[in-house]
Amino acid sequence: MKLTKNRKKLSTKFNRDESYTIEEAVKLVKSTKYTSFDESVDLAINLGVDPRHADQNIRLTTSLPHGTGKDVKVLVVTQGPKEKDAKDAGADYVGKEFLEKLKTGWDDVDKIVATPDMMPELGKLGKVLGPKGLMPNPKSGTVTTDISGSVRDLKSGKIELRVEKNGIVHVQCGKSSFD
């Protein structure tokens, strides 16, 4: 593969085979920036586990102190008085009328939050939402009766960590402009 001039310049600043501490890695990210936009900083950790074994499977959610730097679009599927709570908490889309849009392939959302009473209707969309990673899940806190708390958490930078099939965790943890 042919390297561009900027890539050649960057390849002299670090060694791909060397491991760096978090402090060193952050300094490298800031010193090797050459794009005109605010780059995302991704974290890839090789845990050396086999996710096919249930006892080695890791799946958790955590909140980042300063968010991810990304504006998360949240759809809340609920009905009744919970709709007002969701709108007040900052949800971008609210209501069960969006179920029809989801059936047609609409996916202009990053996360979907639902109340337990709406899960039977959302369950019918499992084949559409599952592969996109949008299906609400009680373990990740997206199936809940506390709609406002869940929406606020997602908007403020709650991320889901999950082991991939090779035993690696990939997650976006911020932007290169973060201090």
Predicted features, each with a name:
Residues H66-K103, V109:
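Glycine-rich active-site/cofactor-binding loop and its immediate structural neighborhood
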Residues E23-K82:
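Translation machinery proteins
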Residues A91-D179:
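Long, charge-patterned amphipathic alpha-helical coiled-coil/hairpin "stalk" segments used as oligomerization
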Residues R52-A54, E83-D85, K103, E121-L122:
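Short active-site-adjacent helix-start/loop capping segments
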Residues M1-N15:
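Generic N-terminal amphipathic, Lys/Arg-enriched alpha-helix
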Residues D17, L75, A114:
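Glycine- and other small-residue-rich loops at beta-strand/loop junctions that grip anionic moieties
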Residues A25, A86, G130:
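Residue-level signature of catalytic and energy-coupling elements of molecular machines
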Residues S11-F14, E18, V26-S36, P51, ...:
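Structural signal for hydrophobic packing residues in well-ordered secondary-structure cores
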